[in-house]
């Protein structure tokens, strides 16, 4: 599509009215988007002002541009939000079966959203404006309170989201199923539950985003060829949480900072748990192999543990590589790669990394673990690193620092076939 021939339309031309909380502008905005698409595509402008709206539908080859000072604010009426409508089979992405956290794309309560992109391509949203999810609660939603997602994508490709902000999401800021060749760039997400949650992705990138979320900042799984780069991540749960196996994932130059600035809605906590949590099968069956996970030049500050890998019984793992990881004020939970059953990891490579832990000054800890089953452990019997069911662990120029006292051993290997290299220990 030629930029010289593309259409530029304002939502004002279709009857949108700013700064009036009693008006639902969804009809006007959707007419503008539809008209732009019918004319071959282009840009739909949202001028400065606050526009209250229910569900909006993106179309192929149309960019929704939020001008400076423009705010799309979700309607306060739950009835103004539609559920996802699609013929796609998304059942493999269901999770939390049998719990209050069960979610399914076919559930009309779970799949409500403010902005939809379904089966479209070459479309997206750009700033520098703002989207306000309005924190609309739904007593029939997950945990009996979660409301509509702010943006929901399904079966989309070649999408671009950049240079805008999202606040007060009533559930996830962005939820996506089966997307490809999609970019999330320079987004600022504040509050709500998960920030960007993608289930099923091929060739996506998340870069230069700033996330201050109550739940996991970035999450999902079944990713291939995914890049997460130069993001600032602050969470009252986990920074990055992969709950389904993925391959060729590159996480680089991200900074993880705790505690969270926005409390977790359910528990009220603000402590950041794991910087990067790779947990296929953690929220229900998610069979498959996780492989080629590369973590490079990331910084962790004031989190419980920097990296955790836990395989489910239906999973295996190939290579997990960690390079130039820096950690400061890490809690008393060791970096770990393990499975509690027999699921194997082929190799873990950790290089050029420097992690400082806060010690747990308790003489009785080493003996406490004797005879205890794994599910009774509140943390690991080692303070720095813990490996279980790994074929090969390679350590090169790794320094583990201990602030304070801790009587546990620094590193523990359980059912590890080969260990190459060692870590340098530095204690107070």
Residue ranges and their predicted role:
Residues 5-428:
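Extracellular/periplasmic carbohydrate-active domains that bind, remodel
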